[in-house]
Amino acid sequence: MSILATVIRPNRRWIVASTILCLAPLAALGEDAGLPQLRQQGSATQLIVDGRPLVMLAGELHNSSSSSLDYMKPIWPKLASLNLNTVIASISWELVEPEEGKFDFSLVDGLIEGARRHDLKLVFIWFATWKNGDGAYVPAWVKTNWTRFPRCHHRPGVNTSQLTALSEENVKADAKAFAAVMRHIRQVDGKKHTVVMMQVENEAGIMPTARDHCPLAEEAFAKPVPREMMDYLIAHKDTLIPDTREIWGKSNFRESGTWSEVFADDADEVFSAYTIGRYIGRVAAAGKAEYPLPMYANAWLVQHKGQKAGQYPSGGPVAKMLDIWRAAAPSIDLLAPDIYLDDFKAICAEYTQSGNPLFIPEASRDEKAGLRAFYAIGRHHALGFAPFGIDSLAETDVLRGHYAVLGSLLPLIAQHQGKESLQGFMQYRDDKRVEFDIGDYHADIEYRSEDGGKPGGGLVIATAPDTFVMAGMNYSIRFAAGRDKPGNTAWLSIEEGAFRDGKWAPGRRLNGDEAWWRLNLGPQPRVLIGKVYRYP
């Protein structure tokens, strides 16, 4: 039986609907109000844990690190020393359910306990049907029974090791295991809230072809596009992202027909995105029925313009498939990019389209990682940021300093998320400067490196119309009179210092050469507070 036979209703505005899914089961489960949930503040979506916003200064472990509690023992203190507040760790179907119906949660329990001992929050990744476009983490009893658990075919008649997304048996087995995991997490963590989010599968999709060609897939592909899919597109036609409108527009926005008739030469990828999204959405929904933590799906990105589906995992939540995933998986609260590409700013912009909350669960762990965190959190008010392979970083890595500064600012950042009073910036390639209005003034920032060409970046928070918290490194800043507000400006006062437990602890009072015209933030991340005044 194909899973397309199962009908779902199309969702309304996506972020509203997904947030409701996070909140609705609370009363039924009897959980307290501190359970992790998503909440809207202005234009931003916040993760609320125990009634307070949590901005995740995170890191993702290497794939196999969390498969051994002994291996993790020396890693936990290192993670804490890097000033993380959240760790992203994988748990796999093959270790959780090594025999059908027999579950082993010892790793889950040990990871939760390790995080608690070091005052860290956890995001668990569910490695199951998909991990990087493959299925290596399904249990042996699934791998070896290809009759009961049918496989994806890259071409007709040729089996692969990857489970097909079109099989009811496949999705039921995955969803049952994930539901058991969520039930157990509720039992052991439903009051302490160490686990704050769940990633459902990992970089799902099909490679090296654009779609599945197994008998179930061929049958479904030849049929009309499911009515609920078309109803979603029709209902959201005016707010679809440009990529969706371009794809659908090739058929002059046909409202019915086969996949090829409606989506033309993009039909294979759209079909894959919808069927994989439906599958993962059902897995997530089964988990939320047990314990409704926020849940997301992550994407292996299109690597360059013109790259064809199948050269990256076809059907995954790449930016151009966001609307298709929203139609297919309303139980998924957000879609998240794994960013290893150079154009970090453009990718962040793509993944904030139509209200998608930005969370970056994987990113390069190079010397720019800290600046990327400043940018994502300051410019896009992201839920969090995580370099991959965090356990490979030395305790003296530069990220430690960036996370220390950001960590000290988190209460203030949370207060200003979703408002124009929080702005982030980051030097990209040959960028020389950036300007923006903030408070009652116009900020003029020049990037300047004092340590061999390293880039600059940071964030600015207007705590009052004339008072600014400035953080980051390798830039200088001045404030000019805002638009339609004539006059000259100067610094009234500048303090160097730090926030401790949300309160400002002043250090040096800067003046003279250090504060003339432009204020310089040098090669080490730091925090300054400046007050500006206007005169005729």
PLM regions: where:
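Bacterial N-terminal signal peptides that target proteins for export
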Residues: 2-18
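N-terminal carbohydrate-binding accessory modules
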Residues: 31-84
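The substrate-binding groove and active-site-proximal loops of carbohydrate-active enzymes
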Residues: 58-67, 90-106, 156-176, 260-277, ...
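Short, acidic/polar
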Residues: 66-80, 313-328
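Aromatic-lined substrate-binding rim segments of carbohydrate-active enzymes
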Residues: 71-146, 277-290
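Polysaccharide-binding and catalytic clefts of secreted carbohydrate-active enzymes
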Residues: 147-322
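Catalytic-core region of carbohydrate-active enzymes that cleave or remodel glycosidic bonds
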Residues: 282-292, 320-413
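Aromatic- and carboxylate-lined catalytic core of secreted/periplasmic carbohydrate-active enzymes
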Residues: 374-485, 497-502
